[in-house]
Design a protein with these regions (language model features):
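Ankyrin repeat boundary signal
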Residues: 93-96, 126-129, 159-163, 194-197, ...
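C-terminal motif of bacterial Sec signal peptides marking the signal peptidase cleavage site
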Residues: 22-24
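Conserved ankyrin/ankyrin-like repeat signature
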Residues: 81, 114-115, 147-148, 181-182, ...
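Bacterial signal peptide processing site
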Residues: 26-28
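Leucine-rich solenoid repeat scaffolds
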Residues: 232-262
Length: 263
């Protein structure tokens, strides 16, 4: 009877313990489920949008061109490739080759007008010189690249303190080589020094007379220089003026123009 009483006392305690255990078992799956849900959220694959962004980023990296690629494209006259490089995230527009020639100078050398304009619009330096002291601006003036010169004068700022290897500006060789249209462009622009003297003391006027043949084109160049105020009394390192050369070489028409200018 005593044992029966003890069992009656212990029974509620056992039932209570069983209830606690059962309650714990019922809540356990909920905790596991929550944990699984959290893990699943963390390892979900990237969205389509993020994949697209990643692909774009990789494409940008691939479009970064190596040093020398712009020079190569310009040297080959490849307009589309040049444009593609200029539209890329990173490039060196004034990179140089072993002769210190920039892409722009090479384009001017080759008279590649569309590529030259493309490079100028992208900010290429028209004053940077190579190992023989040619610059895009000086070369365009000296070698009759009239359309290129006109574009430079309209869209950039030539540095008039940068001279060629003979100490001359763009006007002197333009006059000496018979590029009348370049002479007109430079004089109309008014930024070039009309009476600048190079290492030999030559001005554009002296070279147009003393170093050439006195033909019609040089008569027109002399007239253009005089019309724009060229000083005909300046002397070169040998002490001679443009009129001295005209008389010495028998250029009658030019001599007459110079005498009229001096009177």
């Amino acid at each position: 009877m005593k044992n029966f009483k003890l069992n009656l006392v212990a029974l509620p305690i056992a039932l209570l313990s069983f209830s606690v255990v059962l309650s714990a078992c019922q809540t356990e799956p909920k905790q596991v489920k929550t944990s699984q849900s959290s893990t699943q959220e963390k390892i979900q694959p990237p969205s389509t949008e993020s994949t697209k962004e990643s692909t774009k980023s990789e494409e940008k990296v691939q479009m970064t061109f190596t040093t020398g690629s712009l020079i190569q494209a310009v040297s080959e006259g490849d307009f589309d490739q040049t444009k593609e490089i200029l539209n890329s995230p990173a490039y060196l527009i004034d990179e140089v080759n072993e002769k210190s020639e920039t892409p722009l100078l090479i384009a001017v050398y080759q008279n590649q007008i569309p590529i030259t304009k493309l490079l100028i619009d992208a900010g290429a330096n028209i004053n940077q010189q190579d190992v023989i002291q040619d610059s895009p601006y000086l070369y365009a003036g000296a070698q009759g690249r009239t359309e290129i010169l006109a574009y430079m004068l309209a869209h950039t700022t030539p540095d008039q303190s940068v001279y060629n290897r003979f100490g001359g500006n763009a006007l002197i060789p333009a006059a000496e080589k018979g590029h009348l249209e370049n002479v007109k462009l430079l004089l109309a622009d008014k930024r070039v020094a009309i009476d600048h003297q190079n290492k030999f003391g030559y001005t554009a006027l002296i070279e147009a007379v003393g170093l050439r043949d006195g033909s019609q084109i040089y008569q027109e160049i002399v007239a253009e220089l005089l019309r724009n105020g060229a000083n005909s009394s300046l002397r070169d390192n040998s002490g001679r003026t443009a009129l001295d050369y005209a008389n010495q070489l028998g250029y009658g028409n030019i001599a007459q123009m110079l005498r009229t200018a001096n009177s």
